[in-house]
Amino acid sequence: MNGSSGQYTRGHQSEQVGSDADPAPNAQEGRFTSAEEVAEAELDVISEQGPVQPSHPWTRYVALGDSFTEGIGDPDETRPGYHRGWADRVAEALAEGTQNFAYANLAIRGRLIGQIRDEQIAPALELRPDLITLCAGGNDVIRPGGDPDETARTLDTMVQLLSTTGATIMLFNGPDVRETPVVGSIRGKVAIFNENVRTVAARHDAVVADMWSLRELTRPEMWDEDRLHFSPLGHHTIARMALETLNVGHNLEPLEPRPVPERSWREARVDDVVWARHHLFPWVARRLRGRSSGDGITPKRPNIEPLFGGSMPPGGGSIEES
């Protein structure tokens, strides 16, 4: 990175996962992943190279899902309460050089696949999109007793409805959790769900953004300190992959953070205990009480509105009044 922080350097594309509850592999302190630093690095590239003006057919983009698509883990410090995330980056890239491009994001943190179906599909259809991204089911699969086949059947009905728009539909599969000590045991369930996602995509002529194969996401720097959401760097990396899946040119170069300092086994276990106390146990407690991090949250971009480069209208994730 050429900015003042010096936290990032530009890397090369290395080997080629997201839901509210996809914990990170061994996330630690010392990740150089602040939203401000990543945004500064992205602006450096644009100022040096000029904006890429890609050629693509889309003018109305609607993003659906949970916290992954809302952008949790990537707060926008210029707009309190707003989270940028990979979908905003994709919209920004698509808007460059595209007259009358408009974007809506209906995703809400904590949503299960049935809630996404019931709350987001009908509004999405009313917005008449020509590009739809959908990531749903991760929160269902990770739960004890979660059935990847039943979850995929719900996904299939959702994609069938969305396909009536004639829009390009991009689905996301889940991450490889092999390196994750907390949920590594459900790797098989995630793999089954991922194969089901591919089957659904093939049935409805959708494309798949392959997070399982995005090996960079096994690095702790790609994750927020809660180990449940992606960091700004993670969202940046996923946006690059999504744009390349759509075969769209962009300015999102690989960013290479400084390595995380090595820690002793004892230090790592202390961090695990602190993480469990502050993040894992509260997450479990909410589920036991039937609560969600998304209770009372509204979509950050409920209307399909224009983008002007990287700027966006005010809004995002407000709390509903009782």
Residue positions per predicted region:
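A short helix->loop->beta-strand "cap" motif at the edges of active sites that frequently abuts
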Residues: 164-169, 206
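Charged helix-capping and loop-helix junction motifs
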Residues: 148-156, 187-194
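Conserved catalytic region of serine esterases and O-acyltransferases that act on ester linkages
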Residues: 2-47, 54-57, 203, 226-229, ...
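Oxyanion-hole/transition-state-stabilizing segment in secreted/luminal serine hydrolases
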Residues: 70-76, 99, 113-150, 177
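Structural beta-sheet core signal
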Residues: 63, 134, 170-172
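Short glycine-enriched, charge-decorated loop/helix-capping segments at active-site entrances
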Residues: 75-81, 146-149, 184-188, 224-225
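Serine-esterase "nucleophile elbow" of acetyl-processing enzymes
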Residues: 2-109, 121-128
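Substrate-gating cap/lid alpha-helix
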Residues: 179-212, 232-235
